[in-house]
Amino acid sequence: MLQNERTYIAIDLKSYYASVECMERGLDPMQTNLVVADPSRTEKTICLAVSPALKAYGIPGRARLFEVVERVRQVNAERQRRAPGGRLTGKSADDLALKADASLAVDYLVAPPRMAKYIEVSMQIYGIYLKYISPEDIHTYSIDEVLMDVTGYLETYRTTARELAKTMILDVLHTTGITATAGIGSNLYLCKVAMDMMAKRVPPDENGVRIAHLDERSYRALLWEHRPLTDFWRVGRGYAKKLEEHGLYTMGDVARCSIGKPNEYYNEGLLYKLFGVNAELLIDHAWGWEPCRMADINAYRPETNSSSSGQVLQCPYPYDKARLVVREMAEAVALELLEKRIVTDQLTLTVGYDIENTASGSYRGETVLDPYGRKIPKHAHGTATLGQKTSSVRRIVDAVLGIYDEKADPKLTVRRLTVTANRLVREEDILCEPEQPVQFSLFDDPAARERQLRQEEVKQERERRIQEALLDIKKKYGKNAILSGGSYLDGATARERNRQIGGHKA
């Protein structure tokens, strides 16, 4: 290995949530038809995971539950047509049984999500990785995916990257019953692409393990002509659409465009015109380059200074009912800021309306298309500036409700809500800032103003002590140990959301 050459491994746990649910039931994750979804949210709910056996019927990993129901119905209609005597005599969720008996209908298990369990198993698996790799050389990309810099370990263990990846994956398999896919690359981008795109093409071994490898040369040879562009990491539909509108359909096209002459239509100037500074990363990835290393990830501190809380309501909410949820969300944002010792002076609220508002045909206002191409009323959006940085529940709630009262349409039902605290600053940084001078007019009473400021400070200090007491109680006894009275009214969501992790059942 050259002195500056590095080796990275990406590992992705196979259908993670579904695999955990199968193992909890003593079932084989590779042979059991199972979806992780909350049926109590109706069949429109999104499936968090689909087992590999069920995916084999053409069901995508993030399908909605009704799509699973419909696809299985279609599969069973075809199985019945081919079954002996045209009859299905039973059903099974076991793939081996279904392949052995053509008279069985395809069945599947629906497992409600248990996020706390998935986090617990993920931490257990991370502990397995730590047996081989130091934490500073591991980046946790998601609950079921990690990236590792294994450059310094190959010589230590006297092994290859493939053997090291396989050793770790088999350790995870034997400990938890969950298998995985791995990608190996000469940089972080290539190991991720090898895992996401190439490992799918590799036949699994006897343990269901797939491992693929890419370097810059093989990346260009194997993937420069690959379509669609959205299969590549960090290329979304918007990027792909812009590129295709300009005749760029593959990563090879993007790479060739980047070296065009200034007087030619296709040159890097076109890419920078389309994507701004983001074109630099797109060009690097088109060539299979990635300058970022693990040390850069560990040293990174995000520049964005906002915190948001959003939720999709279980059903369309009328104006007053949605206002109650907005209050709960604003309270939660304020308490989170206090817990983290962060303050804000700007808040935004976005109110998304339900499709039922346009279904009747009576709505005459401005519309936009939702992700399914349906017309819905354009969302309401507003911003409030506080004039002083704070984490006061009272001030934050008043500001957010003020936006809602001003911007939301009382005649429309609400489906989505997002509250965002902007321009966040740590409390300790505020204390270090010099006090801003106050300019008085001839008609101001400085003494009265001073008394008013002191009264407000006392009020804020009393409120802060109450808020900190609330936080202490919630930390000790749970988030639902103490709530405002509004959270017990019909339509309130805080109690249920406090039982969730990431919007799903804990």
Task: Label each residue range with its predicted role.
Residues M1-W287, P291-M294, L442, A447-A506:
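Gly/Gly-Pro- and Ser/Thr-rich, intrinsically disordered tail segments characteristic of DNA damage-repair
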Residues L2-Q3, A10, D231, R237-V414:
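DNA-contacting surface of Y-family translesion DNA polymerases
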Residues K14-Y16, S40-K44, Y353-T358, L424-E428:
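Short, charged/polar surface micro-motifs in flexible loops or helix N-caps
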Residues L147, T385, T418:
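Short aromatic/hydrophobic contact patches that present stacked aromatics
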Residues S186-Y189, D284-W287, V343-I355, T413-V425, ...:
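A glycine-rich phosphate-binding loop feature that marks nucleotide/adenosyl-phosphate handling sites
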Residues A359-Y363, E428-E433, R495:
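Short conserved micro-motifs at the rims of enzyme active sites and ligand-binding pockets
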Residues G402, E406-D472:
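C-terminal hydrophobic structural anchor segments
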